[in-house]
Amino acid sequence: MNTFATQIRLTPTPMALQTRPLSPFVRPLLAVVLLLEAGLLLTSCGRKYRVEGSSTVTTLDGKTLYLRTLDNGKWVSVDSAEVEHGLFRMMGQVDSVVMVTLCMGEEGIMPLILESGRLQVTLSNDVLEAHGTPLNDALYSFIDKRTELADRMEELERREARLVLEGKNFDDIHAELETEMTSLSEEINSYVKNFIQANYENILGPGVFMMVCSTLPYPVMTPEIEAIIDSAPTTFRDNAFVKDYLAKARENMQLLQAQQENALTARN
């Protein structure tokens, strides 16, 4: 199982803002945001935040957008603003760094990190962006780069499909593309691992770890995950949500091993 080569992105579809979360990537990511909002608070001095947003999505005009977090399992609105002529603004005091969700009604649009500084948010039918503060810059730079790598992998897969449809020998196709696919897969794994390791001590480390793990069909240990955990400091390993994932993953691995042993015994 290639842990980090799974397609994850934050690119909206044209009608998404009207009816649903903006991307297949948003669902697992927002699920992670819910967890992180509940427990990943980093103490800081009380400082002011400023969110300035622009939207080219006409259906948003007149709608109210919310910054929401979880408090004891319930949604709490941290701030809100009405979109007027494609613009919205929120300002307030922040006492801790926390992941929040920009929402319209009950639908999550995109994750944001609420921290001291001025954050610029762009909403369109093509892309979602958040820049202007250190952690948001880092998060969306990661998302952009990860999407670029995923697009390259998709193109290789499309090329493989085209060659098959053209009637070329499958073994020849595999030989032609295997090296390139393996190299790109390793690049993706390395990029994600290095990003998490570089952010072990802040909200991005466990946030991105859970984000990529949430794309897996179920919690499981892989060589990539083992490598991240093996070099992680105690603060990362002791994060409640990382610990919960690892406990479930190791339990699943034991179940899988038991199933394999039972199947082998039955055959013998």
Label each region the model flagged:
Residues 176, 180, 187, 191, ...:
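Charge-rich, solvent-exposed alpha-helical interaction surfaces
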Residues 1-54:
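Bacterial Sec-dependent N-terminal signal peptides
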Residues 137-141, 191, 196-203:
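Soluble oligomerization/assembly scaffold segments of membrane-associated complexes
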Residues 174-175, 189-193, 207-214:
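Short, local alpha-helical segments
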Residues 197-200, 204-268:
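Charged, long alpha-helical assembly modules
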Residues 45-189:
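A non-transmembrane, solvent-exposed segment enriched in polar/low-complexity residues
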